[in-house]
């Protein structure tokens, strides 16, 4: 258990610290711009990481929202309850995950709609021999290749998940442990979320240097950062909202939601 605590403390000091949280949106913007320029000006040779069958893409990125939701839900519930001792306030904070899920659903469907209305169906990736299929789904059902404006869903979702986890884990520095099982459970969840952030940042970098064009990646990343900003930097500061994590509320100058 001591190793688990040391691991959580190491992640808190070196990765999920205040400086990284504050500069992460700028870092993500730099990664997507720098990676896109590298792809255009000096493409990297094929590697394991631009193979869509790589293990992180197959088992993590394809289910990135599920992983993020699955790990954040118990973490938010335990940490917020420990600070507030209020089931109502915990449920209020958990409603932020419903908001985030709605944002994920609307944005991904918007991206698919844009790709659908801007695309055409072809026999192959060389875009030869147009086929008479009117939407992406029908085209692929008939073994065609749909070419449209494909906003990077990976850039959107990975950037959004990274910023979401950083906001919600900021609460860790406010917690004082009284029971051993509290420390063990919360440290294990924090360590798992820290590892998830590292995976998301790495795969975001791989997307930037290997896939899509610069406009598709920049727009996807902009949606992710904007979704975070509108919720955590504006709406969640308002009285009628899921509210911020207690640590974030204190930093923003608002009254923390766990105070009576």
Curated annotation (Swiss-Prot):
Recorded catalytic activity of this chain's protein: an acyl-CoA + H2O = an acyl-4'-phosphopantetheine + adenosine 3',5'-bisphosphate + 2 H(+)
Keyword Magnesium: no
Residues at the active site: 154, 212
EC number assigned by the record: 3.6.1.-
Single GO BP term: lipid droplet formation
This protein's UniProt keywords: Endoplasmic reticulum, Hydrolase, Lipid metabolism, Membrane, Transmembrane, Transmembrane helix
Record topological domains on the Cytoplasmic side: 1-23, 79-93, 167-189, 232-260
Annotated localization: Endoplasmic reticulum membrane
UniProt cross-references to InterPro entries, sorted A to Z: FIT, FITM1/2
Annotated TM spans: 24-44, 58-78, 94-114, 146-166, 190-210, 211-231
One function term, GO molecular function aspect: diacylglycerol binding
An annotated GO cellular component: endoplasmic reticulum membrane
Family statement: Belongs to the FIT family. FIT2 subfamily.
HAMAP family reported in the protein's UniProt record: FITM2
Protein name: Acyl-coenzyme A diphosphatase FITM2
Primary gene name: fitm2
